[in-house]
């Protein structure tokens, strides 16, 4: 509220039921109407007792009670009714003990009017305060909260303590665990003469021999494993494993996978061979005919090139051979005789057509 000096010509006549205009002047007598001068004089007489109490206490924090002023004003004329609200300032350092009685009365009335004005906030101020509160929400420290009640006005400062996570200098438990895992040195590979290395070399050699026996190539194994375990398996991976060019950890991991695949491949190969053996026609073993039996069959072939079925049976019984063996021999002998006759006829034809030179 700004204070301005007015001349006597600037004042207008007020109605009787209107409130008096409160201005900041040198004294309360300049701003109060004449009808309240007597009432003010009676009210000031009660103030020195309170001043003596304040001067004797000599405290830095002052407690100003205006209950006496409120009672005095409540008994005044109806046109001069100023509701006085007691105020408590916890951080007030100014002492009003040395102020004059009239200036003290003017200051108390002015403060009462200001507090009444501040008790009803403007809508724009409320909206602005809400916006400011929303923008300052992420801050660690909150601004001081000012509470204005209906019967008292108190100013207090509240600063929430910092979170324990901010004040603590120790890393969280999760971070300590991760740090411990990261700082752990990697496992050293075993020596070249260790049992693990020898067992790995033996398995690599056995795997190569059994793979070749089953008829699989390194590419076939890589494609079969890639279809099940992913694209990290290829012909290069199998080749490096058989040549022991992988790291010990990767070789051990691949060993378990290859051992499982090898067992499945052998089982599948055994089943396949069994089915093929059942479906395949058995080939008869080759029959060996003695020289005496061949001479007897040659004589019979000279007599009759194509014997009957009964004659074949009698010859088979006489030579102690099977009927089918005798029949096949006569078929093969006729085919050979036919080839010999064809070749002789062709050679004689070439001899007749060729010219003779003398």
UniProtKB/Swiss-Prot annotation:
Domain POU-specific: 192-266
Keywords: Activator, DNA-binding, Homeobox, Nucleus, Transcription, Transcription regulation
Annotated motif 9aaTAD, positions: 5-12
Biased composition (Basic and acidic residues): 177-187
Region (Disordered), start-end ranges: 164-195
Alphabetical list of Pfam families matching this protein: Homeodomain (PF00046), Pou (PF00157)
SMART domains, sorted: HOX, POU
PROSITE patterns assigned to the protein according to its UniProt record, in alphabetical order: HOMEOBOX_1 (PS00027), HOMEOBOX_2 (PS50071), POU_1 (PS00035), POU_2 (PS00465), POU_3 (PS51179)
DNA-binding residues: 282-341
UniProt main location, coarse: nucleus
Cell compartment(s), UniProt: Nucleus
An MF annotation (GO) of this entry: core promoter sequence-specific DNA binding
Repeat is among the record's keywords: no
Domain comment in the entry: The 9aaTAD motif is a transactivation domain present in a large number of yeast and animal transcription factors.
Functional note: Transcription factor that activates growth hormone and prolactin genes. Specifically binds to the consensus sequence 5'-TAAAT-3'.
Family: Belongs to the POU transcription factor family. Class-1 subfamily.
Annotated protein name in UniProt: Pituitary-specific positive transcription factor 1
Provenance organism: Oncorhynchus mykiss (Rainbow trout)
Gene (name only): pou1f1
């Amino acid at each position: 509220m700004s204070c301005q000096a007015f001349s006597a010509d600037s004042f207008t006549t007020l109605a009787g039921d209107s409130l008096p205009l409160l201005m900041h002047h040198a004294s309360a007598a300049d701003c109060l109407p004449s009808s309240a001068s007597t009432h003010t004089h009676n009210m000031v007489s009660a103030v020195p007792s309170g001043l003596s109490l304040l001067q004797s206490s000599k405290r830095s924090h002052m407690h100003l009670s205006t209950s006496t002023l409120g009672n005095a004003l409540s008994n005044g004329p109806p046109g001069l009714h100023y509701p006085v609200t007691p105020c408590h300032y916890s951080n007030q350092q100014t002492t009003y003990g040395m102020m004059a009685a009239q200036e003290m009365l003017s200051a108390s009335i002015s403060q009462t009017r200001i507090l009444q004005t501040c008790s009803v906030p403007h809508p724009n101020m409320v909206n602005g305060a809400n916006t400011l509160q929303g923008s300052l929400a992420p801050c660690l420290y909150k601004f001081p909260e000012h509470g204005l009640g209906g019967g008292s006005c108190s100013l207090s400062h509240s600063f929430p303590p910092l979170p324990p996570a901010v004040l603590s200098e120790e890393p969280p438990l999760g971070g300590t665990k991760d740090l411990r895992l990261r700082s752990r040195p990697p496992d050293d590979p075993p020596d070249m003469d260790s049992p693990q290395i020898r067992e790995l070399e033996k398995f690599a050699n056995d795997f190569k021999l059994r793979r070749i026996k089953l008829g699989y190539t390194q590419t076939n194994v890589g494609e079969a494993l890639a279809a099940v375990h992913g694209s990290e398996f290829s012909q290069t991976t199998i080749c490096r494993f058989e040549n022991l060019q992988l790291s010990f950890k990767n070789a051990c991991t691949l060993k378990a996978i290859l051992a499982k695949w090898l067992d499945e491949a052998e089982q599948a190969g055994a089943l396949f061979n069994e089915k093929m053996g059942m479906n395949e026609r058995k080939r008869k073993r080759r029959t060996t005919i003695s020289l005496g039996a061949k001479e007897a069959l040659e004589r019979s072939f000279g007599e009759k090139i194509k014997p009957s079925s009964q004659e074949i049976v009698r010859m088979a019984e006489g030579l102690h051979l099977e009927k089918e063996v005798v029949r096949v021999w006569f078929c093969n002998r006729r085919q050979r005789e036919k080839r010999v006759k064809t070749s002789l006829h062709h050679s004689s034809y070439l001899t007749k057509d060729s010219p003779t030179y003398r």
